[in-house]
Amino acid sequence: ARYVLMDSWFTYPATVTKLSGYLPVIGMVKKTEKVLYGFDGQWLNLKAIYRRVRKKPGRAQVLASTVVRLKKGPAAKLVFVRERHTRNWLALLSTATDLEAADVVRIYGKRWDIEVFFKMAKQHLKLTKEIQCRDFDALIAHTSIVFLRYMFLSFECRLSADQRTFGDLF
């Protein structure tokens, strides 16, 4: 893995600081008054930083980005993006400050595929309900079988729906 992708439940300065010593962290950030970031010589919350940062005009996906300092931690890039179908904004944090804002958004978007996979595995492939045991090896075997089911289904879906898999037929 090249990055640690985190949901807003886990993207707090202490966690980010600890993990960033091993891998760069990219995560969604909550709009809370309690978490402060170093910006222009002051410690401000996310909403205050958003008000002060210069936004891009028009309907751009990335509204703004800026580099901030985490308390007792590294520098981080905040990327403000437009929330779909609303006038609201969301904030992403990346400890890889050299990444472009669009790359931060693209990399964080990969997390959504992981969420879809686990929802599918739990709802339709019985990841959590098909087995009840206390043996670690049995749990690993069950999880492996569920993952295999998912791979077979996604492979079949790609064969039947993706035009790129038809080969020389067309």
What are the residue ranges of the model-derived segments?
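Single, function-defining residue in the core of a domain
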Residues: 1-170
